[in-house]
Amino acid sequence: MKIDLIISADDIKEEKVKNKTAVVIDMLRATSVITTALNNGCKRVVPVLTVEEALKKVKEYGKDAILGGERKGLKIEGFDFSNSPMEYTEDVVKGKTLIMTTTNGTRAIKGSETARDILIGSVLNGEAVAEKIVELNNDVVIVNAGTYGEFSIDDFICSGYIINCVMDRMKKLELTDAATTAQYVYKTNEDIKGFVKYAKHYKRIMELGLKKDFEYCCKKDIVKLVPQYTNGEIL
């Protein structure tokens, strides 16, 4: 098995993801939201690229659909919820369809559509994602959403954590230089919360008063679910 890594949604190329197992990571905060919502009983998450498409989809899915997402970290006008995992509690999401659009994460998911399997990864479910990777037994590309098309420390160290979890389960692995570096960064900085504080994205999260979101998104393996994207929906 070979593991590769893409550093941002802007860097996705079809030949890099086609027929592989793609693991999409937007640790702060889209993939953490998706994982949390589904773990709390959300029926499905439908990722879309634009606000206009989200408004159209919510009509298609009817009364059990809710709108969530952000632009530049802020809740979108007219939406039910922002991109805070703390908002997606069981009483809010159980049995609902979440229509979601975000600045970085949903672009990374949609950009990975030629992959054989698309898994949604985060620190919250890193061990479970690693188990699924081993089960699928296919070459892997970890797709970092990044931040506005740029490299993001948070997604990178989360990738390293998941790669490390796979390495604990499989000895015969081939890592690209990017994947090797991510795993090394994690192994030398296993306190993810402490290391992510160096990230530009962290500063933005703090500016928005989202410390609780940050602390939650850094919790390792509190979710055993591995969301999978197929035919336009994440289940």
Curated annotation (Swiss-Prot):
Reactions catalysed according to its record: (2R)-O-phospho-3-sulfolactate + H2O = (2R)-3-sulfolactate + phosphate
Molecular functions per Gene Ontology: 2-phosphosulfolactate phosphatase activity; magnesium ion binding; sulfopyruvate decarboxylase activity
InterPro entries referenced in this protein's UniProt entry, alphabetically: ComB-like, ComB-like_sf
Keywords: Hydrolase, Magnesium
The keyword Magnesium appears for this protein: yes
Required cofactor names: Mg(2+)
Enzyme Commission numbers on file: 3.1.3.71
PANTHER family, A to Z: 2-PHOSPHOSULFOLACTATE PHOSPHATASE-RELATED
Protein name: Probable 2-phosphosulfolactate phosphatase
Gene: comB
